[in-house]
Amino acid sequence: MLFTFTDEIKVIFVKDTMEEIINGLLIVLVPMVLGYLVKIQNQNALAFINKIVMLLLYVILFMMGFMLGQLEHLEQKLPIIVMTALGLSAIILTCNILGLAIYDRTLPKPVNYLQGELPSRWHSLMDSIKLLSAVIIGIVLGWLCNDWLHFPHGSNLYVLIALIFFVGIQLRNNGISLKEVLLNKQGLIMGAIFTLSSLIGGVISAFFLSMPITQGLAFSSGFGWYSLSSVVLTNAWGPMQGSIAFFNDLSREILSLFLIPLFMQHYRSTAIGITGATALDCTLPIIQKSGGIEVTPIAISFGMVTNLLPPLLLVFFSSFPI
């Protein structure tokens, strides 16, 4: 059989794609592993690291907004970004709820009643609004400074590397036994159901929103980790796609604040699962207060799955051109 020019092009494409995937995984996973190796016992140092993580998060979101503000014909593209993100969020979240609710009905679990006072959902909502404000400020300044100020290409990636390194330090020093988390069967099953239902939602979204399937799968792979998905997709496809990913994943966090108490009493897996990657951080206090202390290992096990998979899935799906 002759080796045609078309075959050669396919080989080159596959090789370049694999190199992009490997490089992307190294960029994301290496700093997390290095951070996880750092053991810190000083509580003041840990508190300082927590502040650094929040600062870097605001910087990343501001930079993403700044680059979005410098898009040509922004006034025409912004409504498309918001409407696309809302469509993605509605479809993917619906698939998550259906999949996890079926699991809840098949394997019902006892649930503790509400323990203590719920953390203020309005306080958590204000935190989300602050993050959104960083993007909006970036958009305005990017639009105003478009003629004379531009960030170097890929500069937001270096900020992301620093952020992931410090997140790795946080994971290493969270005080939860790794054995307790890894051996939690329910959390792992929930993670698998959540991942599968999210990807199904991505395919359905691609069909209804008239986008390539790989793009729909990429948008569904953020799992609520907006600081990661927005940067990865911005660098892969541009600030417009990165902004869609941001609004899609941020909406999961905001909606979770209200849906967790609503589902926890009768649909515990659903209540935990809709949070996605945020189960390890901002929504964990609400999960614990709504479902009792025994749901904490489940949430952390689930959160580990939904924090480990997004880098792999995002890098893989975003390596395909659109």
Task: Enumerate the predicted regions with their spans.
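Entry/N-cap segments of selected transmembrane alpha helices
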Residues: 20-32, 75-98, 127, 131, ...
